[in-house]
Amino acid sequence: MKPRATLVLFAAVVVSWMPAVYYGFRLWSVRDVEPSGQKEPDPAFHFVLIAQDVNNPYWRVVYRGAADAAAAHGGAVEFLGPVEANMERHIRLIERSVSAGVDGILTQGLDETTFRPVIDKAIERGVPVVTIDTDAPTSKRLAYVGSDNYLAGVQAGRFMAQATGGVARIGVVTGSFEATNMKQRLKGFEDAIRPFSGMRIVAVESSNISRVRAIEKTALLLNRYPEINALFGASALDGTAMAQVVSGRGRRDVFILAFDDLPETIEWMRKGVIAATVVQEPYRMGYDGVELLLRAARNERLESNYYTATRILTAKEVSSRGPASDGADSGGTEATNADATKIGATGAIATDAGAADADG
């Protein structure tokens, strides 16, 4: 029995040492062998795109353009912003990005008085800032890339006047009463319809860049002012909300002019509910914004404004063509600024929204 017990004990010791022997051999056998795969290189630069609402499909298209441009140069763009428009949170994200030492910032200058100090502080701290979609021209930002929002409003007003025969009672829903781009669009629209005595804006409401609020405000306008027979939505979500309300009420007599060519907007145009929309170039804004930050890093001189084209896209045109892309510039009947400065682009690395925003 004793020899057998000794054999069992020996076997147990051998078994217990087998993992150590195996992994020790593995370590010895690979110590001079190069790894089969290479570590991903660090990005050449780290920019951030800070939007007013990361859930807005329009800003997803802007981000896609920025991400494609960054990838073409071996860099990265992080997409940040509140989940619902909130200027205070937006500004905090700019401040946090500056503190984190990012290489550049693309952001809106939603309200110039509010955003100018934080943009100026970023520049003073050595972080280049390019405004996108909405400018803050009196700030120290390096450049602006985006639509000429006043001209886009003028174009919208002229088109509505022409389409309605110069006679309409108009309800307007704008994304914000404070945002510079929204104020510019509304001012352009008002100036364009002023020569037409039969055109009158009955009331203006704000959706605060919220689909739910846009629906509520549209319903309010139609309930309070039954004479309204035309609607203008000045931000991307307003027109689709108007279409939903008007369609639900069976009001085929209401002329709707929207802003941007989101897939839902295009679908309502196919159904004949939205008559036309003002088309922007969000992808190009994002792409060219990154290109401008890279040019600034090379100490190249930048112009103050780089306007991207805007144009009217009609329901008739949509119905005569194939499916539209999601939010890309769809082409249209008239560019407001065909001679705008163009940058030239070559095109996608990304991190998801809200990574640095504990507030959401």
Model-derived regions, located:
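An alpha-beta-alpha
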Residues: 47, 156-196, 203-204, 293, ...
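Hydrophobic alpha-helical
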Residues: 107-123, 189, 203, 207-266
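Flexible loop/hinge segments that line or gate small-molecule binding clefts
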Residues: 114-151, 262-270
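Short, solvent-exposed amphipathic alpha-helices that sit
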Residues: 58-73, 152-156, 180-199, 213, ...
